Amino acid sequence: AWDQRIEFVNQNGMAALAAPTVERWCSGGFHASGSAKLDEMRAMVSATPATGFIGCARALQGLDYHRRIGEISARALFIAGSDDNATPADNMRLMHADLSGSEFVELSPAGHLSNMEQPEVYTETLRSFLG
């Protein structure tokens, strides 16, 4: 998927990537709400320099969260959106299972940017974890 997005940006620019990216990041209910945050997210993606996006995409292509997750000794909290198409909640559950002592919270309804869709619940979850 990353190679296709990189090629798309090279051919069409970041503005053309904004709508499909935000579509993938957010839950259907959030889209249906017509929140002004959707326009803010599209503007953010559009304003991202193509070279920055491509560099991040290349970095994410080879990222393997599971390979060394057991080496983490710090407390960890996994927050997943129930409707996250970018990093599905099941993937987060696997990481949680692989990291002893970690905590897992699924926010619903929420997509990849659960902090934008459920800001109060997300913030309270984080505050509670941090103590």
Each PLM stretch: what is its role?
Residues 21, 57-60, 95, 122, ...:
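Hydrophobic "lid"/C-terminal helical patch
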Residues 3, 35-39, 89-93:
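Short, surface-exposed alpha-helical segments at coil->helix boundaries
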Residues 9, 45, 84-87, 111-117:
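Glycosyltransferase donor-binding loop in the core domain
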Residues 19-20, 38-67:
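Hydrophobic, aromatic-rich cap/lid helix
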Residues 74, 88-97:
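Short alpha-helix in the alpha/beta-hydrolase fold that links the catalytic acid
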Residues 72, 78-80, 84:
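Short beta-strand/loop motif that positions the catalytic acidic residue
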Residues 1-20, 24-25:
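Flexible "cap/lid" loop of the alpha/beta hydrolase fold
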